[in-house]
């Protein structure tokens, strides 16, 4: 029999950790935070409801729980996402980035037995892509990427040998913008029937905000990914295209691969997209500026910031910093954590053996972090390295430098 006293302890822990989280600084590039407005649907009855009537057919209300707010999905979410991506066709039903990946492969990869080309994981591609292709019945081929550029000779050979149905560009670990236009040109030259899809999960917010190029403008047929990394949305996924035929292929795959699309999260995505149309451009530009400034400050202070020969550290929200061996990195990470600053340690970043801090300034920026906050954050990194100011107040000192957030505060 359940002991209610134990449940009370669990609830107390949740509440305590929620207070702690609210005071923390998160520097994880694959995470972000919902605005108060976008968070609202997750605590409503719509979290419990199905919604299938995408066309708002008055004779198709088989599930009526979402009827009163249906247009938040069909018009607000789809409409704002469409305008942000400049893509008339949007599928907002994927429940995650991997969910969107499955739908894209199943819908665009052709009959089983064909080849799906993706980015080598050692070059920054997603760890699951090649295996996902094989599990869906496709052959998998990978290509290396260096500083955002696909190896053209290698890629051309893959196109000629495999004549793939789908090229799935899935760069997740990168300090550089993915160059899509040259890939599209090579496909047109060597395998013109091949579909080019760009998984921009990590850079979605930077693309929709205009800080990075839109892959659809560069020749991609489709794009998509998760909506909770540089884009400040819920844990969901989305797919975009300008082709009605490809939209139908994606929709057909989605229909048989996904039932519940998590209605409340989709409403949250709609509200996040509406806010992003107001704040997104300024936010995206500030994210890149903050990442570059943090890299410059840390490098000037003696930190081993990964950069190109010309000193260029990043074009995205990601910044990579080496602290030392595993023990040194863990000690540094724990010091920051004890001071309310959470960092992400990775051991398989392209060209960087051993543990590395993979930092993201997307959430800090969304919550109001501008130049002053980045300067304060760099000071806390110095404190962690030098072992000074062990007062647990690091995140508070950074937050004191926040400016206005990139969302509507009236809904807080």
From Swiss-Prot:
The keyword Transferase applies. Transaldolase involved in the biosynthesis of the capuramycin-type nucleoside antibiotic A-503083. Catalyzes the condensation of L-threonine and uridine-5'-aldehyde to form 5'-C-glycyluridine (GlyU). Forms (5'S,6'S)-GlyU. Its cofactor is pyridoxal 5'-phosphate. GO terms for biological process: antibiotic biosynthetic process; glycine biosynthetic process from serine; tetrahydrofolate metabolic process. GO terms for cellular component: cytoplasm. This is L-threonine:uridine-5'-aldehyde transaldolase. Disulfide bonds: none annotated. The keyword Transferase applies. Belongs to the SHMT family. InterPro entries: PyrdxlP-dep_Trfase, PyrdxlP-dep_Trfase_major, PyrdxlP-dep_Trfase_small, Ser_HO-MeTrfase-like, SHMT-like_dom. Its EC number is 2.2.1.-. The modification N6-(pyridoxal phosphate)lysine is found at residue 229. It catalyses: uridine-5'-aldehyde + L-threonine = (5'S,6'S)-C-glycyluridine + acetaldehyde. It is an enzyme of class 2 (transferase). GO terms for molecular function: glycine hydroxymethyltransferase activity; pyridoxal phosphate binding. Gene3D superfamilies: Aspartate Aminotransferase, domain 1, Type I PLP-dependent aspartate aminotransferase-like (Major domain). It comes from Streptomyces sp.
């Amino acid at each position: 029999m359940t002991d209610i006293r134990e449940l009370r302890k669990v609830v107390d822990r949740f509440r305590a950790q929620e207070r702690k989280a609210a005071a923390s600084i998160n520097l994880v590039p694959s995470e972000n935070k919902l605005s108060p407005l976008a968070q609202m649907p997750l605590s409503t009855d719509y979290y419990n409801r199905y919604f299938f009537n995408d066309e708002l057919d008055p004779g198709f209300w088989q599930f009526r729980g979402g009827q009163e707010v249906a247009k938040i999905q069909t018009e607000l979410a789809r409409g704002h996402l469409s305008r942000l991506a400049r893509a008339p066709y949007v599928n907002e039903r994927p429940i995650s980035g991997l969910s969107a990946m499955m739908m894209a492969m199943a819908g665009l990869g052709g009959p089983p037995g064909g080849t799906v080309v993706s980015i080598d994981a050692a070059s920054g591609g997603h760890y699951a892509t090649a295996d996902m292709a094989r599990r869906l019945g496709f052959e998998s081929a990978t290509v290396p990427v260096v500083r955002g550029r696909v190896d053209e000779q290698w890629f051309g050979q893959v196109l000629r040998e495999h004549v793939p149905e789908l090229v799935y560009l899935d760069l997740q670990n990168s300090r550089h913008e993915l160059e899509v236009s040259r890939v599209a040109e090579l496909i047109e030259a060597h395998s013109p029937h091949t579909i080019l899809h760009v998984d921009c999960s990590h850079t979605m917010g930077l693309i929709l905000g205009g800080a990075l190029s839109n892959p659809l403008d560069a020749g991609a047929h489709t794009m998509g990914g998760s909506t909770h990394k540089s884009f400040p949305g819920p844990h969901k996924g989305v797919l975009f295209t300008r082709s009605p035929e490809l939209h139908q292929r994606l929709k057909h795959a989605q229909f048989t691969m996904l039932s519940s699309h998590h209605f409340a999260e989709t409403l949250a995505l709609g509200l996040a997209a509406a806010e992003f149309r107001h704040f997104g451009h300024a936010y995206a530009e500030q994210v890149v500026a903050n990442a570059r400034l943090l890299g410059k400050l840390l490098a000037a202070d003696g930190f081993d910031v990964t950069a190109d020969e010309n000193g260029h550290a990043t074009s995205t929200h990601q910044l990579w910093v080496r602290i030392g061996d595993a023990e040194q990195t863990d000690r540094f990470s724990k010091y920051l954590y004890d001071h309310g600053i959470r960092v992400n340690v990775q051991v398989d970043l392209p060209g960087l053996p051993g543990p590395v801090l993979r930092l993201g300034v997307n959430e800090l920026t969304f919550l109001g972090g501008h130049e002053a906050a980045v300067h304060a954050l760099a000071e806390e990194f110095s404190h962690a390295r030098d072992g000074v100011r062990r007062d647990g107040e690091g995140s508070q000192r950074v937050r004191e430098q926040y400016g206005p957030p990139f969302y509507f505060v009236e809904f807080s």
